[in-house]
Amino acid sequence: MSLIRRGNAFDPFSLDLWDPVDGFPFGSGGSSSSSGSLFPRANSDAAAFAGARIDWKETPEVHVFKADVPGLKKEEVKVEVDDGNILQISGERSREQEEKSDKWHRVERSSGKFLRRFRLPENTKPEQIKASMENGVLTVTVPKEEPKKPDVKSIQISG
């Protein structure tokens, strides 16, 4: 059993899902068994979906999401808001067209999809979300609403 993930740690499309019982004899979904499993090994497409690494930080003014998407063009990445408060970041890298005359010696770059969803806090302005991409890093900025100041009402004391 290994705690180290298989695949290239710098490629969000190539990571396998870690199986905590991989290698045990009682039917893990890992390489040691192909039968039913408590934790079935994901196929490469499912692993690609889970593999996208995204950081989320909050500042006093905004929420910032940063995703490593090396090799993707901005046309291959989607940023959407679903139901007003679910931020969805997805992308797809297609396979390179192969010519019959091509002879491949090594294929390390993978193709696949990823999809990540985040529930935005109530104090955000989803209609003002901005996204940019530079050097293989997608940055999504979600502005926050200014905190509401409590209404203070003076009560006149009688008597």
Curated annotation (Swiss-Prot):
InterPro entries: A-crystallin/Hsp20_dom (IPR002068), CS_dom (IPR007052), HSP20-like_chaperone (IPR008978), Small_HSP (IPR031107). It is found in: Cytoplasm. GO terms for cellular component: cytoplasm. One of its GO terms (biological process) is response to copper ion. PROSITE patterns: SHSP (PS01031). Keywords: Cytoplasm, Stress response. The keyword Chaperone does not apply. It comes from the Eukaryota. SUPFAM superfamilies: HSP20-like chaperones. PANTHER family: HEAT-SHOCK PROTEIN 20 FAMILY MEMBER. May form oligomeric structures. This is 17.7 kDa class I heat shock protein. It comes from Oryza sativa subsp. japonica (Rice). The lineage of its organism: Eukaryota, Viridiplantae, Streptophyta, Embryophyta, Tracheophyta. The gene is HSP17.7.
